[in-house]
Amino acid sequence: WGYHQSMGLGYFEYFQFCEDIGAEPLPVLAAGVPCQNSACHGDLRGGQQGGIPMSEMGAYIQDILDLIEWANGDAKKTKWGKVRAEAGHPKPFNLKYIGIGNEDLITDIFEERFTMIFNAIKEKYPEMVVVGTVGPFNEGTDYVEGWKLADKLGVPMVDEHYYQTPGWFLNNQDFYDKYDRSKKTKVYLGEYATHIPGRKANIETALT
């Protein structure tokens, strides 16, 4: 979002950090499409959504499967488990969750690629909890279509994001009280923050 990033935290460092603090890692990978918001800072290409060419999706999906094998594979029996062991971590990380997509527009381009990735993961690693996305907001077309896709595929969990005003949070403390807890798809709140016009932080946003 326009600020400096060292790019010094890779999967290995992230997984080790989670291990050190006793947290479950949740790496999030692109669903075969780029974030439509990533080019909005002075770049006129922002707001569009392309997709990895279908001819390259097989290789991209294999990269995702390789990451799971790298995290969980046996150090002696698997290619990527051996790579992990040679890097200094012979014990598997026991990865349980993997996110596919983040605040994406739920278009035909997205749905086709997400479905391919989801099915490939479930086929090879049926125990893996795939966390999907239902768009950038908690309402609107992408939210509705994202939930439709999650219900259709039986996605175990979706990541909902909330960037709202202090008043919204105060008036929606019971937001999930009526959530159908018998649904197969559960909700993970991966991002939330209170914003006022201009997105400046103050005591009001801190307290809500």
Regions found by a protein language model. Give the residues of each.
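Catalytic-core region of carbohydrate-active enzymes that cleave or remodel glycosidic bonds
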Residues: 119-122, 126-129, 147-152, 156-208
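N-terminal catalytic cores of secreted or lumenal carbohydrate-active enzymes
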Residues: 1-146, 152, 170
